[in-house]
Amino acid sequence: MLVTPEYVFKDVTHITPEWLAQKCIRALVLDIDNTLTADRSQELPEEVAGWLEAMRRAGVKLTIVSNGAEKRVRPFAEKLGLAYLYRSAKPLPFALGVARRRMQVKRREMALVGDQLYADRMAAALYGIPGLMVIPRGPDLGAQVVLKRKWEKKHWQEYYDRGGKTL
């Protein structure tokens, strides 16, 4: 299913280099808002900074792909020293192809980490890569996202009804 989650993690810090290695994933495309940090925040939680460093030490390639504007994405990504794409138009998968080529990995070696089913999970499914969904880090500040969250509820329920677990 394009929208129902495949994998769900409590937050990004529960995605480990060991888990990625078991799945042969060498590169991650990362969303920002409610994935790495709270919605619209420029502050990175300490535990997420440590997680990013652990991923780098493990050789995992990282790129930010966000639907946000350049003025939102660029300062955040540059502070972290990460490559980035802004206004990526997820769920359309085109930016994922750009990110894959920049990271110089095969499609089967990458996954997308995000919090929204109708943007992140659908983009991953359309591109043919795993979507690693995380529980949102905080409340949604945009009316459009609040509306999408209501639509997402049935897909989250499908995941758990099928025996899906939060990792």
Model-found features: residue ranges?
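Asp-based, Mg2+/Mn2+-dependent phosphohydrolase catalytic module
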Residues: M1-L30, T37, S41-Q42, E47-L112, ...
